[in-house]
Curated annotation (Swiss-Prot):
Residues 1-327 are annotated as: Ribokinase. The gene is hldE. InterPro entries: Bifunc_HldE, Carboh/pur_kinase_PfkB_CS, Cyt_trans-like, PfkB_dom, RfaE_dom_I, RfaE_dom_II, Ribokinase-like, Rossmann-like_a/b/a_fold. ATP binds at N201, R202, K203, E204. The keyword Cytoplasm does not apply. Keywords: ATP-binding, Carbohydrate metabolism, Kinase, Multifunctional enzyme, Nucleotide-binding, Nucleotidyltransferase, Transferase. One of its GO terms (biological process) is ADP-L-glycero-beta-D-manno-heptose biosynthetic process. Catalyzes the ADP transfer from ATP to D-glycero-beta-D-manno-heptose 1-phosphate, yielding ADP-D-glycero-beta-D-manno-heptose. GO terms for cellular component: cytosol. This is Bifunctional protein HldE.
Length: 483
């Protein structure tokens, strides 16, 4: 893994990405399925939760903003409830601006997904694919082009990126010296000639080239065929799902990148995350190979999340900093990030455990407790007292190690899946937020005296008291060191 990758996300701040494409509203309806309809052989979903978010080109822009940069979104909406919802979401999104062309006669594109557990049961599309007002779209694009560092064309074949609009946008960007990243939908890849990089998935590449991707060699052939279609195109990055990605750069040998996702929960919007990361990496001065590597990591992160989600700069930096660059190595999270990770674990039916402590000078007693805690669950969260919290509990000479050092040591253990810092005297708020299936403390406590035991037992969880290793304590260690 390129050592420079971990530093790239820090360079995203201050960059502006101009996104032109098909904006849509993504709605997710979650529920339980426990019976078949008596009216027809179809499952009945008992709706539990509904969410809505920016989709399509809007999700590219949302990912840009989440990565710490500024996104300017150019798209097309109708004068309807879905269009109004999209405009409201854009206004509420930090780091995101938009120039939306409104067509009163048009329906705003909307995708509704019905999800139960880890399965998408049904998708309902409401859309108008007729060509939009190309002149108005290009006028908005050209107005914002000068302030952009890079351009993304996000094509979902919903009427925005007609051949004329694509040609006008690429020509204007080239004249202004702006790189162009294309997420294509048309089978005619020649229309994207002059772009910096095109990012088809395996299906789109096969439809455009006639080469079905069955191996690395076939993917190399497809990449070469794409470059032959568009002489002015610099590179093609074919995303291949579980097989990873293949990067074909003109006059360079192809590069194969293995998939990085450890667990795949939802691929919705993953291509948008990849496109946003590619664009920002290129804007930050990365080579196309580096940009592809970073985008590959981002794609692996986002498919492990629920619904159309985003990747943050902090998550990407942590992932790129790990030895293998694997999403599973991201173990230190803030409360909000941890909440999303836990939701994903729970949606996959994993048993979540929780323990907590200061873990100032890690010793065999700590290691034993953590090993026992992990044995009682599938994923273990460690709530870690911040420096201020430790000082309040243990006195002004503690902690010996600062919180970041303590978190890093804990995160290096195979028994620990997630470390979350907390400032409070007790981890009660974390326990209420994460609702662990198993709460673990040392056997020097009783079940009744474990903080949060009443909460966990109240919703049917379990409290485990781990056996202690005699004579092991941080206080004793410090005393021996000072004697």
């Amino acid at each position: 893994m390129d050592d420079a990758l971990a530093h790239l996300p820090r360079a995203f701040a201050g960059k502006t990405v101009l996104v032109l494409g098909d904006v849509m509203l993504d709605r997710f309806i979650y529920g339980a399925v426990d019976r078949i309809s008596p009216e027809a052989p179809v499952p009945v979903i008992a709706v539990e939760k509904e969410t809505a978010m920016l989709g399509g080109a809007g999700n590219v822009a949302r990912n840009v903003a989440a990565l710490g940069a500024k996104a300017v979104l150019i798209g097309l909406v109708g004068r309807d409830d879905a269009g109004a919802a999209l405009r409201g979401m854009i206004d509420a999104e930090a780091g995101l601006e938009a120039e939306l062309v409104v067509d009163p006669a048009r329906r705003t594109t909307e995708k509704v997904r019905y999800i139960s557990g880890s399965h998408q049961m049904l998708r309902v599309d409401r859309e108008d694919r007729s060509p939009g007002d190309g002149a108005a779209l290009l006028a908005a694009f050209e107005t914002r082009l000068a302030s952009a560092d890079v351009v993304v064309l996000s094509d979902y074949a919903k009427g925005v990126l007609t051949p004329a609009v694509v040609r006008g946008a690429i020509d204007a960007a080239k004249a202004a010296g702006k790189p162009v990243i294309v997420d294509p939908k048309s089978r005619d890849f020649a229309r994207y000639d002059g772009a910096t990089l095109i990012k088809p998935n395996r299906k789109e590449a096969a439809e455009a080239t006639g080469i079905v991707e069955t191996s690395d060699a076939a993917s190399e052939d497809a990449g070469a065929a794409i470059l032959a279609m568009a002489p002015g195109l610099q590179a093609a990055l074919i995303t291949r799902g579980g097989a990873g990605m293949t990067l074909a750069v003109r006059n360079q040998p192809p590069i194969h990148l293995p998939a990085t996702a450890i667990e795949v929960f939802d691929v919705s919007g993953a291509g948008d995350t990849v496109a946003a990361t590619l664009a920002l990496a290129v804007a930050a001065g990365a080579s196309l190979a580096q940009a592809a590597q970073l985008a590959n990591l981002a794609g692996g992160l986002v498919v492990a999340k629920l619904g159309t989600d985003v990747v943050t700069a902090a998550e990407l930096t942590a992932c790129a900093s790990s030895a293998q660059g694997e999403p599973g190595e991201i173990k230190i999270a803030d409360r909000e990030q941890a909440q999303r990770i836990v939701e994903g674990w729970r949606a996959r039916g994993l048993k979540v455990g929780f323990t907590n402590g200061c873990f100032d000078l890690l010793h065999p007693g700590h290691v034993s407790l953590l090993s026992q805690a992990k044995a009682a669950c599938d994923r273990l969260i460690v709530g870690l007292n911040t420096d201020a919290s430790v000082s309040k509990l243990k006195g002004p000479t503690r902690p010996v190690q600062k919180e970041q050092g303590r978190a890093t040591v804990l995160a290096s253990l195979s028994s620990v899946d997630l470390v979350v810092l907390f400032d409070e005297d007790t981890p009660l708020e974390l326990i209420k937020a994460f609702r662990p299936d198993v709460l673990v403390k040392g056997a020097d406590y009783t079940v009744e005296t474990v903080v949060g035991s009443d909460v966990v037992l109240g919703y049917g969880g379990k409290v485990v008291l781990a056996e202690l290793k005699q004579g092991q304590s941080t206080t004793n260690l410090i005393a021996r060191m000072n004697s």
